[in-house]
A protein has these predicted regions:
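A non-catalytic, amphipathic alpha-helix used as a structural packing/dimerization or gating element
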Residues: 15-18, 22, 103-114, 142
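Extreme N-terminal tail/first-helix region
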Residues: 1-18
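Short, contiguous alpha-helical
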Residues: 17, 36-87, 116, 121-160
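Acidic/His metal-coordination segments adjacent to aromatic residues that form catalytic metal sites
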Residues: 4-8, 46, 88-104, 127-133
Length: 160
């Protein structure tokens, strides 16, 4: 039995929300000093990880709009699982690293809300199995979960 498009959309949205909740829980209770301490994830602070997540959503949002219009997604030209984003991440972090913590936390909520609203506007065809829109949504949820795990591992190592 195949699932109805509305059920599929709801499942994808729930997965996104669950992943974001895992991310939020991973840094819940940390002080401003702990959130901005470098070395939490590689050279990055937790704040850096969060602004990195915002930058990913901000990168993906125009493609969700393209897909909603029936246009081609720019990111669809690359294998998102195989591509190395190290140079892109470094360039974006050089621009975003000095943002204040309160702004990063605000943008984390805003970008997620914008992403969820964009997902709600997507036609069912973009959410079908093997469709790029579905992949983009799944990768975004996995991205939150991956970085939540990194933060939790750091907290365990630091006794936080």
């Amino acid at each position: 039995m195949t699932s109805r498009p509305d059920d599929d959309r709801e499942r994808l949205a729930r997965n996104l929300e669950q992943a974001r909740n895992e991310l939020r829980a991973s840094f819940q209770g940390l002080s401003d000093e702990q959130l901005t301490r470098t070395g939490a994830v590689g050279e990055w602070s937790v704040k850096d990880v969060l602004t990195h997540i915002v930058s990913w959503e901000e990168t993906a949002l125009p493609d969700l709009a393209r897909l909603a219009r029936g246009d081609t997604a720019v990111l669809g030209a690359i294998d998102l699982y195989a591509a190395s984003f190290d140079a892109v991440n470094a360039a974006i972090m050089s621009l975003r690293r000095n943002l204040p913590l309160d702004q990063v936390l605000r943008e984390l909520d805003i970008s997620h809300g914008d992403f969820m609203a964009a997902v709600a506007r997507l036609p069912d065809s973009v959410l079908a199995e093997e469709a790029f829109g579905r992949l983009l949504i799944q990768i975004t949820a996995e991205h939150d979960q991956e970085h939540a795990q990194h933060i939790l591992e750091w907290r365990k190592t630091e006794g936080l």
